[in-house]
């Protein structure tokens, strides 16, 4: 399990480094915004905005409401769609970006997913990457190696390269890169204010419209993984995996699509065999009503570890 602490996150979410936070704070008076831009961490920003809030939790909740209700952020769309638009537009250019091959390589096909590669992507992305960078000397050669695998860092390099090449669709490409950066910042901040952290892992999955998964841990060392997918052909699919005593697995599946439910039910034995082959003991796989998906994960004794957009 990869874990993070609030101490590692505090100085990452600043108006100067998180575009989503800067967008929300634009609604605040200009003189207050200038003051907030000099803040050292998210905690001091929240204290400055919400002096009457009794706890950090209330501060987070108020900023979370501002974030969720911001009209610009509500219309962002999915990262996956923005990335497809960018790569498609890039194909029409006569000249290639130096980083283009790296971007294509990052968008690996989910059919070829490898557990070791996925683990490496998680450990070297988002807040986990930023916490590693904080402990390195700025001249350390390892920094470039770490950044080469991070999608957000790749977007920054892409923007730098675009500014130096006379592409026909240069303005459109730069706008999409800015949108992608804003989308990633938005999900990171949204998850952080919900007592977690988020990252984006790029994968190609033609059947997928949008998707995310979050990993949580309760006070009894049980782990829960919520997988939320929007499939192009079948619509919404929610799966919750519960791991107990590090080896016993429960699986709950929920979908409003009857055809998808029937297909999944017909493949349950194969699914159980594949899960068992990993060394886990599958105790239960059940289908539940979509209206019953508000699990105990919303209780205070279960904390969000991290969230991943795919």
Show which residues each predicted segment covers.
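Extended non-catalytic alpha-helical interaction modules
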Residues: 1-236, 242-310
């Amino acid at each position: 399990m990869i874990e993070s602490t609030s101490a590692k996150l505090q100085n990452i979410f600043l108006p100067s480094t998180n575009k989503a936070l800067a967008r929300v704070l634009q609604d605040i008076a200009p003189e207050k915004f200038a003051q907030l831009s000099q803040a050292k961490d998210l905690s001091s920003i929240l204290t400055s905005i919400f002096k009457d809030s009794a706890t950090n939790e209330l501060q987070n909740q108020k900023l979370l409401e501002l974030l969720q209700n911001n009209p610009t952020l509500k219309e962002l769309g999915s990262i996956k769609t923005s990335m497809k638009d960018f790569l498609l537009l890039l194909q029409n250019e006569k000249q290639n970006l130096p980083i283009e091959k790296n971007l294509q390589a990052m968008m690996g096909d989910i059919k070829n997913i490898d557990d070791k590669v996925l683990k490496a992507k998680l450990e070297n992305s988002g807040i986990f990457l930023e916490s590693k960078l904080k402990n390195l000397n700025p001249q350390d050669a390892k920094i470039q190696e770490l950044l080469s695998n991070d999608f957000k860092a790749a977007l920054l390099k892409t923007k730098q390269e675009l500014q130096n090449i006379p592409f026909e669709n240069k303005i459109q490409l730069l706008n999409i890169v800015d949108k992608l950066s804003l989308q990633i910042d938005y999900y990171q901040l949204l998850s952080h204010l919900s007592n977690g952290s988020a990252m984006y892992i790029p994968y190609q999955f033609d059947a997928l419209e949008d998707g995310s998964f979050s990993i949580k841990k309760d006070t009894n060392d049980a782990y829960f993984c919520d997988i939320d997918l929007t499939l192009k052909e079948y619509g919404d699919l929610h799966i919750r995996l519960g791991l107990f005593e590090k080896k016993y697995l429960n699986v709950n599946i929920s979908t409003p699509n009857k055809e998808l439910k029937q297909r999944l039910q017909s493949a349950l034995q194969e699914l159980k065999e594949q899960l068992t082959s990993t060394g886990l003991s599958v105790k239960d796989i059940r289908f539940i009503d979509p209206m019953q998906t508000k699990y105990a994960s919303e209780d205070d004794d279960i904390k969000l570890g991290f969230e991943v957009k795919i």
